[in-house]
C-alpha cells in the first residue's frame, strides 16, 4: 500500500481544460458538467499509465467513495450519480 504520498490532482480535461478526470472515461467540471466516453475524456485514459494516484473534486460524497464533480453530481472512478450534497447552493424555503 502506498501511504503518506501526496495525492496529486487528476489531469485537466474538457473544453479549455476546465474539467478534471474522475476515471478513465469521465471528465467533469463545475462549469462543464460531466462528459462520459467522449473525445473530452480520451486524455483521462493516460492516468492509467501514471504511477501515482490522483484525486479530483474537493468534497467527499457517495458514502465517501466519490467526490463532488459538478453541481449535484458525485463521481468515483467507477461512475457518477446525482447527489444533493454536491448542489452548489442548497436552497431553504
Curated annotation (Swiss-Prot):
Gene3D superfamilies hit by this protein: Neurohypophysial hormone domain
Keywords, alphabetical: Disulfide bond
InterPro entries xref list: Neurhyp_horm (IPR000981), Neurhyp_horm_dom_sf (IPR036387)
Disulfide bond as UniProt keyword: yes
Gene Ontology cellular component terms for the protein in this record: extracellular space; secretory granule
Disulfide bonds: 10-54, 13-27, 21-44, 28-34, 61-74, 68-86, 75-80
Molecular-function GO terms, alphabetical: neurohypophyseal hormone activity; V1A vasopressin receptor binding
Stated role: Neurophysin 1 specifically binds oxytocin.
PANTHER family recorded: NEUROPHYSIN, VASOPRESSIN-NEUROPHYSIN 2-COPEPTIN
Family: Belongs to the vasopressin/oxytocin family.
Protein name as annotated: Neurophysin 1
